[in-house]
């Protein structure tokens, strides 16, 4: 049995969900509500010690890290392939998969600053401390504490956007001749970068709009049936976030 523990339209969750839909691989969806911190409950941490989504569980064996999960899916379910056959094209696909993974911390910072911080600042101090105490990854713990406290400085956000803008520029250049980053074949590189580019467009539209080649690629990507399925909100796999502040459940 293939089970995917995910949180709907979070960046890394979308990458793996889209891949599975593109390939037509059936899976059992296990939604993890991050806003009620289900990812920090003992049962989830036993599967994923980092306390992040997604986690793929195949016949009882957990696979973590979205990049590793996507490679695993291609290894176990090779058809239809989302990895180019040509070695040079495959290296290009892997490069952009790695870039999407490497730039994620910068994307997380601007997302927290624009979307999450307002909510986190309303959480009482005792709950903030309890949540932070359960977060195993130091960088993520620091990001959460900053978003619930003094927030991110203008320099922090400017630096994150500078990194993101650099990546968007490089990716736009790599899309020629197109239509996809590895040419005619749609690949994991496109899937991984779509989650990054789409989030940048949502938070700062001009970063994509001023790059016509990138904007055209994004429009083509969003027209794919698997993307429309994966990126839709208000669905069983991507329900709307709960309103208000949900208390952290007591540890078992």
Question: Across the structure, where does each feature detected by a protein language model lie?
Answer:
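GST-like fold's C-terminal all-alpha helical module
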Residues: 105-219
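C-terminal or late-domain output modules
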Residues: 5-6, 14, 23, 176-185, ...
